[in-house]
Amino acid sequence: MPLTRIAPTPSGYLHAGNAINFLITAEVARAVGAGIRLRIDDLDAERMRPPYVDDIFASLRWLGIAWSEGPRDRMEHERMYSQLSRLARYEECLHVLKEQGDLYACSCSRAGQKRSACDCRKRERPFNAPNVAWRLHLPSDAVVRVEPIHGEAQWLSPSRLMSDPVLRQRAEHGARPAYQLASVCDDADQGVTHIVRGEDLLASTACQLYLAERLGLEAFRRVRFLHHPLVTDATGAKLSKSEGAASLKGMRESGQWPDALREQALRLLDGMRAGTAQSSVP
């Protein structure tokens, strides 16, 4: 059976951009006859708060989205579904990549990587050196095929879309596995077949498809993707938790209903099919 997923991060209260992504995901699931798995990406323990996890369940129920797999509340999530219970699996994947020579230890900041000033791979720093992250090398000649839910397939070069991503954080951040690795491992292991994302995550999709190739995760390489336009405010700025976008919690508590968000999600999806998609909220 086809399966898609909703995978929020509990680093703040959800906003309209999250809601529209969830609603588009639910509509895609309905159209292709897929189940929906709820996965809460909770590896970032420093920013996670219990009220943010509770907000995910409250928001999905307020939006009228039913899911067929995953936790029903915070306690069940912590007991049975937390990504922290999969650390051994992520370490197994890191070991495979390390043995294949796909990883290198890096002490550079994100800014240093973006300036292409990093020479850590050439210097072959030890993986157990202090204050290093483990990065995935993206070869300049690597190309991946992105299978779409709507439209034509794309061929993308991961290295042209992003610098080498961190797959394991520095020790000061708990040496924990990073988003790109956990996301592709979870999607592959959980049988996800359809993924809906904002277009700002196209680079992540390319990176994860290459990562799946290196890990032999063939199921992920067959996943179909839909990358929707970003949901912006009236000024054209992307909605985000860090910028204080109006929360769904605030909407619920003020007595608002999600009808306008549902209509906007359907308009956006119809626009994508017709090639005219735009999305902003007042």
Pin down the residues of each PLM region.
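N-terminal Rossmann-like or analogous alpha/beta NTP/dinucleotide-binding catalytic cores
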Residues: 1-117, 199-211, 215-220, 271-275
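Alpha-helical context
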Residues: 1-5, 32-36, 70-74, 79, ...
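Short C-terminal domain-edge/linker segments immediately following a structured domain
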Residues: 67-71, 169, 212-215, 226, ...
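Active-site cores that bind ATP or allylic diphosphates and position pyrophosphate for catalysis
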Residues: 105-240, 247-252, 273
